[in-house]
Regions:
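Iron-sulfur cluster-binding electron-transfer modules in prokaryotic oxidoreductases
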Residues: 1-186
Protein backbone atom coordinates (compact mmCIF):
# COMPACT_ATOMS: atom_id res chain seq x y z
CA UNK A 1 0.00 0.00 0.00
CA UNK A 2 3.04 2.29 0.13
CA UNK A 3 3.13 2.66 3.92
CA UNK A 4 6.76 1.54 4.36
CA UNK A 5 7.88 4.20 1.88
CA UNK A 6 5.75 6.86 3.55
CA UNK A 7 7.24 6.05 6.95
CA UNK A 8 10.70 6.52 5.48
CA UNK A 9 9.84 10.00 4.18
CA UNK A 10 9.60 8.90 0.54
CA UNK A 11 6.17 10.24 -0.50
CA UNK A 12 6.65 9.84 -4.26
CA UNK A 13 7.54 6.16 -3.91
CA UNK A 14 4.70 5.67 -1.41
CA UNK A 15 2.18 7.21 -3.80
CA UNK A 16 3.51 5.17 -6.74
CA UNK A 17 3.17 1.92 -4.77
CA UNK A 18 -0.29 2.94 -3.59
CA UNK A 19 -1.42 3.61 -7.18
CA UNK A 20 -0.04 0.20 -8.18
CA UNK A 21 -2.00 -1.50 -5.40
CA UNK A 22 -5.14 0.48 -6.24
CA UNK A 23 -4.97 -0.68 -9.86
CA UNK A 24 -4.57 -4.29 -8.72
CA UNK A 25 -7.54 -3.88 -6.36
CA UNK A 26 -9.68 -2.42 -9.14
CA UNK A 27 -8.95 -5.48 -11.25
CA UNK A 28 -9.43 -7.95 -8.38
CA UNK A 29 -12.71 -6.33 -7.32
CA UNK A 30 -14.15 -6.23 -10.84
CA UNK A 31 -13.87 -2.43 -10.95
CA UNK A 32 -15.23 -1.98 -7.45
CA UNK A 33 -18.12 -4.45 -7.68
CA UNK A 34 -16.67 -6.52 -4.83
CA UNK A 35 -15.67 -5.10 -1.45
CA UNK A 36 -12.01 -5.07 -0.41
CA UNK A 37 -11.15 -6.01 3.18
CA UNK A 38 -7.72 -4.90 4.39
CA UNK A 39 -6.39 -6.76 7.43
CA UNK A 40 -3.78 -4.21 8.49
CA UNK A 41 -5.08 -0.82 9.61
CA UNK A 42 -2.17 1.35 8.37
CA UNK A 43 -2.85 0.17 4.81
CA UNK A 44 -6.60 0.55 5.27
CA UNK A 45 -6.11 4.17 6.24
CA UNK A 46 -3.97 4.87 3.16
CA UNK A 47 -6.25 3.05 0.72
CA UNK A 48 -9.48 4.55 2.07
CA UNK A 49 -8.32 8.04 1.06
CA UNK A 50 -8.94 7.44 -2.65
CA UNK A 51 -11.61 4.77 -2.52
CA UNK A 52 -14.52 6.96 -3.64
CA UNK A 53 -12.63 8.52 -6.55
CA UNK A 54 -11.63 5.04 -7.73
CA UNK A 55 -15.00 3.43 -7.14
CA UNK A 56 -13.60 0.98 -4.57
CA UNK A 57 -15.29 -0.18 -1.37
CA UNK A 58 -12.41 -0.54 1.09
CA UNK A 59 -13.10 -1.85 4.59
CA UNK A 60 -10.69 -2.06 7.48
CA UNK A 61 -10.80 -5.45 9.17
CA UNK A 62 -12.29 -3.82 12.29
CA UNK A 63 -15.34 -2.35 10.56
CA UNK A 64 -15.82 -5.48 8.43
CA UNK A 65 -15.76 -7.79 11.45
CA UNK A 66 -17.99 -5.50 13.51
CA UNK A 67 -20.54 -4.61 10.84
CA UNK A 68 -20.63 -7.63 8.52
CA UNK A 69 -19.23 -10.68 10.30
CA UNK A 70 -20.24 -10.55 13.98
CA UNK A 71 -23.99 -10.29 13.25
CA UNK A 72 -23.72 -13.61 11.40
CA UNK A 73 -21.95 -15.48 14.20
CA UNK A 74 -22.84 -17.02 17.51
CA UNK A 75 -20.18 -15.91 19.97
CA UNK A 76 -19.04 -17.77 23.06
CA UNK A 77 -17.38 -15.27 25.39
CA UNK A 78 -14.01 -16.65 26.49
CA UNK A 79 -13.33 -16.65 30.26
CA UNK A 80 -10.10 -14.70 29.74
CA UNK A 81 -8.47 -11.34 30.27
CA UNK A 82 -6.99 -10.05 27.03
CA UNK A 83 -5.01 -6.99 26.01
CA UNK A 84 -6.18 -4.82 23.12
CA UNK A 85 -4.12 -2.30 21.19
CA UNK A 86 -6.01 0.13 18.94
CA UNK A 87 -3.39 1.24 16.41
CA UNK A 88 -2.81 4.88 15.48
CA UNK A 89 -4.51 4.13 12.16
CA UNK A 90 -7.51 2.52 13.88
CA UNK A 91 -7.88 5.66 15.97
CA UNK A 92 -7.43 7.96 12.96
CA UNK A 93 -10.25 6.12 11.17
CA UNK A 94 -12.47 6.43 14.27
CA UNK A 95 -12.73 2.65 14.65
CA UNK A 96 -11.42 2.18 18.20
CA UNK A 97 -14.94 1.83 19.66
CA UNK A 98 -15.80 -0.92 17.16
CA UNK A 99 -12.50 -2.68 17.88
CA UNK A 100 -13.23 -2.61 21.61
CA UNK A 101 -16.79 -3.87 21.01
CA UNK A 102 -15.41 -6.84 19.05
CA UNK A 103 -12.99 -7.70 21.85
CA UNK A 104 -15.65 -7.30 24.56
CA UNK A 105 -17.99 -9.60 22.64
CA UNK A 106 -15.29 -12.28 22.68
CA UNK A 107 -13.57 -12.03 26.08
CA UNK A 108 -14.75 -11.47 29.65
CA UNK A 109 -12.19 -8.75 30.38
CA UNK A 110 -10.46 -6.41 27.93
CA UNK A 111 -7.47 -4.30 28.97
CA UNK A 112 -6.43 -1.25 26.93
CA UNK A 113 -3.43 0.18 28.80
CA UNK A 114 -3.94 3.90 29.47
CA UNK A 115 -0.32 4.93 28.97
CA UNK A 116 0.19 3.10 25.67
CA UNK A 117 -1.35 4.86 22.70
CA UNK A 118 1.17 4.32 19.89
CA UNK A 119 3.29 1.19 19.43
CA UNK A 120 6.18 3.29 18.14
CA UNK A 121 6.86 0.96 15.23
CA UNK A 122 6.33 3.86 12.79
CA UNK A 123 5.62 1.90 9.63
CA UNK A 124 8.68 -0.32 9.45
CA UNK A 125 11.11 1.81 11.45
CA UNK A 126 10.84 -0.59 14.37
CA UNK A 127 13.00 -3.01 12.42
CA UNK A 128 15.88 -0.54 12.15
CA UNK A 129 15.26 1.76 15.13
CA UNK A 130 14.01 -0.59 17.86
CA UNK A 131 14.50 2.12 20.49
CA UNK A 132 11.42 3.93 19.09
CA UNK A 133 9.30 0.88 19.80
CA UNK A 134 10.96 0.27 23.18
CA UNK A 135 10.31 3.85 24.27
CA UNK A 136 6.68 3.88 23.15
CA UNK A 137 5.96 0.57 24.90
CA UNK A 138 8.05 1.07 28.05
CA UNK A 139 4.92 1.02 30.28
CA UNK A 140 3.13 -1.85 28.54
CA UNK A 141 4.32 -4.87 30.51
CA UNK A 142 3.59 -3.28 33.89
CA UNK A 143 0.12 -2.22 32.71
CA UNK A 144 -1.00 -5.78 32.01
CA UNK A 145 -2.19 -8.00 34.87
CA UNK A 146 -0.66 -11.45 35.25
CA UNK A 147 -3.99 -13.00 34.21
CA UNK A 148 -3.66 -11.36 30.80
CA UNK A 149 -1.81 -13.83 28.61
CA UNK A 150 -2.65 -12.68 25.07
CA UNK A 151 -3.18 -9.51 23.10
CA UNK A 152 -4.87 -8.42 19.90
CA UNK A 153 -4.52 -5.58 17.42
CA UNK A 154 -4.86 -4.79 13.70
CA UNK A 155 -1.28 -4.28 12.49
CA UNK A 156 1.28 -7.06 12.22
CA UNK A 157 4.24 -4.75 12.79
CA UNK A 158 2.61 -3.31 15.91
CA UNK A 159 1.92 -6.86 17.08
CA UNK A 160 5.62 -7.73 16.74
CA UNK A 161 6.63 -4.88 19.04
CA UNK A 162 3.73 -5.41 21.44
CA UNK A 163 4.69 -9.08 21.80
CA UNK A 164 8.34 -8.24 22.32
CA UNK A 165 7.72 -5.64 25.03
CA UNK A 166 4.78 -7.22 26.87
CA UNK A 167 5.90 -10.81 27.21
CA UNK A 168 2.56 -11.84 25.69
CA UNK A 169 1.71 -12.98 22.20
CA UNK A 170 -0.19 -10.33 20.21
CA UNK A 171 -1.91 -11.16 16.95
CA UNK A 172 -4.76 -10.02 14.73
CA UNK A 173 -8.21 -9.49 16.23
CA UNK A 174 -9.40 -11.98 13.58
CA UNK A 175 -7.88 -14.80 15.63
CA UNK A 176 -9.89 -13.78 18.70
CA UNK A 177 -13.13 -13.77 16.70
CA UNK A 178 -12.25 -17.17 15.28
CA UNK A 179 -11.60 -18.59 18.75
CA UNK A 180 -14.96 -17.53 20.16
CA UNK A 181 -17.28 -17.95 17.20
CA UNK A 182 -19.54 -20.40 15.46
CA UNK A 183 -21.64 -19.83 12.35
CA UNK A 184 -25.19 -18.64 12.97
CA UNK A 185 -27.45 -21.46 11.84
CA UNK A 186 -30.74 -19.59 12.13
Amino acid sequence: CGQPFASKGLPEQADAKQREVEQALLKASRNGADPIVIDTSPCSLRLKRNQQALGLKVYDITEFLHDAVLPRLTLRKLPETIALHPTCSTTNMGLQTKLKAIAEACAERVIIPDRVSCCGWAGDKGFTLPELNASALRDLKAALPEACQSGYSTSRTCEIGLSLHSGRYYRSIVYLVDRCSQPNTS
